[in-house]
Amino acid sequence: RDRNNLRLLNLERQNLIAAKENHEIAKERYLLGDLSGIEMREAQKSLLDAEERILSAEYDTKMCEISLLQISGKITEYLK
Protein backbone atom coordinates (compact mmCIF):
# COMPACT_ATOMS: atom_id res chain seq x y z
CA ARG A 1 0.00 0.00 0.00
CA ASP A 2 2.85 2.35 0.85
CA ARG A 3 4.44 1.87 -2.58
CA ASN A 4 1.12 2.57 -4.26
CA ASN A 5 0.78 5.78 -2.25
CA LEU A 6 4.28 6.85 -3.25
CA ARG A 7 3.60 6.09 -6.91
CA LEU A 8 0.34 8.01 -6.75
CA LEU A 9 2.08 10.94 -5.06
CA ASN A 10 4.73 11.03 -7.79
CA LEU A 11 2.06 10.90 -10.49
CA GLU A 12 0.13 13.72 -8.84
CA ARG A 13 3.31 15.81 -8.66
CA GLN A 14 3.76 15.33 -12.40
CA ASN A 15 0.08 16.17 -12.96
CA LEU A 16 0.46 19.34 -10.92
CA ILE A 17 3.41 20.45 -13.04
CA ALA A 18 1.37 19.84 -16.20
CA ALA A 19 -1.65 21.65 -14.75
CA LYS A 20 0.50 24.68 -13.87
CA GLU A 21 1.96 24.75 -17.38
CA ASN A 22 -1.51 24.44 -18.92
CA HIS A 23 -2.79 27.22 -16.68
CA GLU A 24 0.05 29.53 -17.75
CA ILE A 25 -0.65 28.81 -21.41
CA ALA A 26 -4.36 29.41 -20.84
CA LYS A 27 -3.63 32.74 -19.12
CA GLU A 28 -1.50 33.89 -22.04
CA ARG A 29 -4.15 32.83 -24.56
CA TYR A 30 -6.87 34.53 -22.50
CA LEU A 31 -4.91 37.78 -22.36
CA LEU A 32 -4.46 37.61 -26.13
CA GLY A 33 -8.20 37.10 -26.57
CA ASP A 34 -7.68 33.61 -27.95
CA LEU A 35 -9.46 31.86 -25.06
CA SER A 36 -12.96 32.38 -23.71
CA GLY A 37 -13.71 33.15 -20.09
CA ILE A 38 -15.30 29.73 -19.67
CA GLU A 39 -12.20 28.00 -21.01
CA MET A 40 -10.05 30.07 -18.65
CA ARG A 41 -12.22 29.01 -15.72
CA GLU A 42 -11.83 25.39 -16.78
CA ALA A 43 -8.03 25.79 -16.75
CA GLN A 44 -8.23 27.36 -13.29
CA LYS A 45 -10.43 24.53 -12.04
CA SER A 46 -8.04 21.94 -13.46
CA LEU A 47 -5.19 23.56 -11.54
CA LEU A 48 -7.20 23.66 -8.32
CA ASP A 49 -8.22 20.02 -8.78
CA ALA A 50 -4.57 19.02 -9.28
CA GLU A 51 -3.58 20.92 -6.12
CA GLU A 52 -6.35 19.20 -4.18
CA ARG A 53 -5.33 15.76 -5.45
CA ILE A 54 -1.69 16.26 -4.47
CA LEU A 55 -2.68 17.37 -0.98
CA SER A 56 -4.83 14.29 -0.65
CA ALA A 57 -2.02 12.04 -1.91
CA GLU A 58 0.45 13.66 0.51
CA TYR A 59 -1.96 13.13 3.39
CA ASP A 60 -2.59 9.48 2.47
CA THR A 61 1.14 8.83 2.15
CA LYS A 62 1.88 10.41 5.53
CA MET A 63 -0.93 8.46 7.20
CA CYS A 64 0.46 5.24 5.74
CA GLU A 65 3.93 6.14 7.01
CA ILE A 66 2.58 6.80 10.50
CA SER A 67 0.67 3.50 10.46
CA LEU A 68 3.85 1.63 9.53
CA LEU A 69 5.73 3.37 12.33
CA GLN A 70 3.01 2.40 14.80
CA ILE A 71 3.04 -1.22 13.65
CA SER A 72 6.84 -1.39 13.87
CA GLY A 73 6.87 0.23 17.31
CA LYS A 74 9.00 3.15 16.11
CA ILE A 75 6.37 5.86 16.44
CA THR A 76 7.97 7.33 19.58
CA GLU A 77 11.27 7.82 17.70
CA TYR A 78 9.36 9.63 14.97
CA LEU A 79 7.69 11.94 17.49
CA LYS A 80 10.98 13.02 19.15
Where are these regions (language model features)?
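Terminal intrinsically disordered/low-complexity segments used for targeting and assembly
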Residues: 69-80
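Amphipathic alpha-helical coiled-coil segments
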Residues: 1-53, 60-71
